[in-house]
Amino acid sequence: MKKNDVFASYAVVPPQAARNPEFYQKRNLPIPTLSVVSENDKGVVISGMKMLATSAIFANEIWIGNLIPLAPDQVKQSITCAIPCNANGLSLWMRQPLSNHYDNQFDAPLSWNQDETDVLVMCDKVLVPWERIFVKDDAIQAREIYFKTPAHCYGNHQSNVRYWSKMELIVGLCYKVAKATGADEVPAVRETLGKMSALESTLSGMIYGQIENAENWPENFKTFNRRIMYAALNFCTDNYSMIIDELRTLCGGGVFQMPASIKVMKNKELLNDFETYFQTPQMNALDRMKLFKLAWDVVGSEFAGRQLQYEKFYAGASFIIRNHNFRETPWNHFEDVVDKVMSKYDVPIKP
């Protein structure tokens, strides 16, 4: 991949409706979950669906795998492989791009070029050569490859860093929006800004902790600290809605006061009114509009809605993330702490 500069996406979750195979079996319907349907000297043939391959329409390759546990008898669904995006029988079903709604970046600064299209991968008798297969006929190993190796840790450390970068943008927006209205001088608003700063700093500390307290695992390798990484993952998915709501509150009705489009600048009469009445003591009209258009793309646009859904579920539902944390916790250590305290006292002896 490095040598050929390959851009790859991945699809490692079965479609929601396919998680109840009995429904399809009772109706004599094919189960939508991607599985091996046949094999020959050249490789295996796969059919079915996987979700969601983010940015797959721009990718060279798609990694097909299983991040959700399989039943031991689901050996045909356990296939883990890589397929090129131009493979015969492969189709990519994507939602409508959000950037289609706009004709310039000023009115939708993030929607314009930051939308990551979500793709459902459908295979119709796709031939996968043997050399492109990593796991076959092993329902347990198909998932364990992510946790018995640093794969899941490395991928989600990057997710933590990505989230931190977004957090810096949101905290910056909180401060600039407050300054744009003069609200940054209000003690209650400063409390909110301090809270946002503390949240950003907490995440940065967790990321540095993953690096500074890296593990010697597997043998002869360094891996980001898994326990701290999963704790950060839990922090990120738990707090995104609240973080966005804080920015939303600071924006107030300001995001609705702006003209519908920057095209107002092309009309001299409208431009004069805009520059006169939309300015504030803290900011001129154009800069204020530019700021609030960006803030809206973070808190209220269709792009913002997709981001909210993504940040809550990209690593799985909350119970999945917390089970990762459970798995990495040194419970024996915590039990020992309790036992040491209890060992220092006993049933009192009556005088």
Q: Where are the predicted features?
A:
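Charged/polar positions within long, soluble alpha-helices
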Residues: 13, 179, 205-212, 241-248, ...
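Short, charged, amphipathic alpha-helical segments
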Residues: 187-194, 222-230
